[in-house]
Design a protein with these regions (language model features):
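Glycine/proline-enriched, intrinsically flexible loops and inter-domain linkers
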Residues: 1-86, 91-114, 118-588
Length: 588
């Protein structure tokens, strides 16, 4: 590449066009998708790769859906070779034959040609409301193998040279429970890839192919240099982190452990998961690309935040990920993987972050409140039609970072906040459930010099039919989200069904029957803390008490700050005694 041929203005324009195009793709999906997960919760992702399967732009979206998708692009290149043409669109959701995350995340890839030369790939991926299988939604804890989890679609053309392959779509949509809704969402994803093609071809026509490709090389070179410089500032050594999920959905109440060793040598870093648990029978197993995505994402959190929107293949080159085959972080076919984005997937990110928090305590990051999802299946009496409902509403808040409290209401750690909560009105319009309570809860955040975001309480009444509920997308009843640098972990979660005066405990990774009139109650732990709680600014503790984030009792026993319950003022003398601080000399 002739570096002198790329001027700063052109480079900036090309680089930002890649980023803005991906965001535009997400906006298209927000406006056109129909299912609740995509349209309201934004469980979608979009990115751009080059003809060598190098990642060029992945500015926003769930970590598991993006950073490892170069494996999918490589698979497509290997499978189709020269049999790729302008107008092709390729569908894939198979974790083992196409390297998807789990079956509900359908991805549509479009090769982008300029004058018959393959230049780029784009991907739009979104969580489908159903993918067939034994239970609606895809989070089925009792599946025997991955084929029981749903329809496995290896990379297959659904458009060829611009012509829709209706027979392929007919086969696919005939194997899901809501074919018309899935059809609309599929076309929305395809439309997003067409937007990307239009924008990139316009860019190439404006600046010329060679100039754009020169800019790509410079983009990769700059991010690699920046990340190597960041790693070089970290003290050489090996740093360890670990985290556990409640169980695998098959062997109940037996934690599944992810263990990580991060080794820093000069300007390179290795993230090694070799000490993690072996592959499990249950559905929490991750495939290699999913593990890679989360390990890379966890690493990026500790680097210069101004790079966050611009990470690409260059950023990834200095980081090596080791995940032994046959483990929960690199499962072998036909292992079930349906619950992996929530359970074990979260722990991969947490273990990576815990290790790097030791390496860089001045950038320490605590984990977020655990996901408290569910998939409820029944019939809506208003329409007589079947429905499947899920939510992120009961998730706890974000974990603290060094220097800042965790965000209130953010969710969830594996998505880094890109997936959002829904709203009460939308839930009640779409589903036969009435939301009775939905609020933050006092004393449900992990304490620290900087505390985590608060936990959440959520209650919903079933005004529909009898049905079923899978809690495969839940975790955190037995295992805490890890804290950092002396902070305290977020509290455990709990849930139950209230039925005819009886409380039925609802645990993660189980199947339950739902009856009309049931009240589903969830209380989630919040994010974990960073730093010793006794070092928290007493004025911030007072504000937390006034704002009802923490109680007077927690303020005194955990934070060691004494507050008068009548005047709501700090008792400084008692506080210094509680904290073991010397008395201040009076001014004479």
């Amino acid at each position: 590449m002739n570096k002198g041929s790329v001027d700063a203005i052109t480079l900036s324009t090309v680089w930002h066009t890649f980023q803005s195009t991906c965001r535009e793709m997400r906006h298209v999906l927000d406006r056109t998708a129909q299912n609740y997960l995509m349209a309201q919760l934004h469980d979608v992702a979009a990115g751009i790769w080059d003809a060598q399967a190098r990642t060029l732009a992945v500015p926003a979206g769930p970590t598991s859906q993006l950073l490892g998708q170069k494996f999918s692009v490589r698979y497509i290149l290997d499978k189709f070779g020269d049999n790729l043409y302008p107008g092709d669109v390729i569908l894939n959701n198979d974790p083992y034959h196409g390297y998807c995350n789990h079956l509900p995340d359908w991805g549509f890839f479009r090769p982008i040609f300029y004058k018959d030369e393959l230049l780029f790939f784009t991907l739009a991926r979104g969580h489908q409301m159903d993918t067939g299988g034994s239970y609606p939604g895809g989070y089925f804890p009792d599946a025997y193998d991955i084929h029981a989890e749903g329809l496995c679609i290896p990379p297959i053309k659904v458009f060829e040279k611009g012509v829709e392959r209706k027979d392929v779509f007919e086969l696919v949509w005939n194997n899901v429970r809501w074919p018309e809704a899935v059809r609309v969402d599929n076309y929305a994803l395809i439309a997003a890839t067409k937007i990307c093609e239009n924008r990139l071809l316009a860019l190439v026509k404006r600046y010329g192919k060679d100039t754009v490709l020169d800019c790509v090389e410079e983009m990769l070179s700059r991010t690699e240099r920046a990340i190597r410089a960041e790693i070089a500032r970290v003290p050489d050594g090996t740093y360890c982190g670990e985290s556990a999920s409640d169980d695998d959905g098959s062997e109940h109440d037996v934690p599944v452990w992810v263990r990580c060793e991060v080794t820093v040598r000069g300007d390179e870093m290795t993230v090694d998961f070799s000490k993690s648990d072996k592959q499990r029978k249950g559905f929490v197993n991750n495939t290699l690309p999913s593990t890679y995505s989360r390990a890379i994402a966890g690493s990026f959190l500790f680097f210069d935040s101004s790079l966050a929107d611009f990470h690409n293949e260059g950023s990834m080159n200095p980081v090596k990920v080791v995940a032994p085959e046959g483990s929960v972080v690199n499962a072998k076919y036909p292992a079930t993987v349906g619950g992996s984005p929530v359970s074990v997937g979260t722990q991969i990110l947490e273990a990576t972050v815990m290790a790097l928090s030791q390496a860089m305590p001045h950038k320490a990051i605590a984990s977020w409140g655990r996901h408290r999802g569910h998939y409820i299946f029944g019939t809506d009496p208003r329409t007589g039609e079947r429905y499947v409902q899920t939510t992120f509403d009961s998730d706890g808040g974000a974990g603290a970072v060094w220097g800042f409290d965790g965000y209130e209401g953010a969710c969830t750690f594996p998505t880094l906040g890109s997936v959002q909560r829904g709203n009460v009105e939308e839930v009640e319009i779409r589903f036969p459930w009435r939301i009775l309570r939905y609020h933050m809860v006092k004393d449900l955040s992990g304490a620290g010099r900087w505390r985590g975001g608060s936990g959440m309480h959520w209650e919903a009444l079933n005004v529909g039919s009898d049905g079923g509920m899978a809690t495969g997308s839940s975790d955190g009843d037995q295992t805490h989200p890890p804290a950092a640098a002396g902070g305290m972990p977020g509290p455990l979660c709990k849930a139950y069904l209230q039925r005819d005066g009886e409380q039925i405990v609802v645990k993660p990774h189980r199947m339950y029957q739902i009856r009309k009139g049931d009240l589903l109650v969830k209380t989630s732990g919040g994010g974990s803390g960073v730093g010793n709680p006794r070092e928290r600014d007493p004025e911030k503790v007072l504000n937390d008490v006034i704002d009802e984030f923490i109680s007077l009792d927690v303020a005194e026993k955990i934070y060691r700050v004494a507050i008068d319950p009548i005047t709501m003022e700090i008792n400084w003398e008692k506080t210094r005694t509680l904290r073991g601080e010397p008395e201040k000399e009076s001014v004479k």
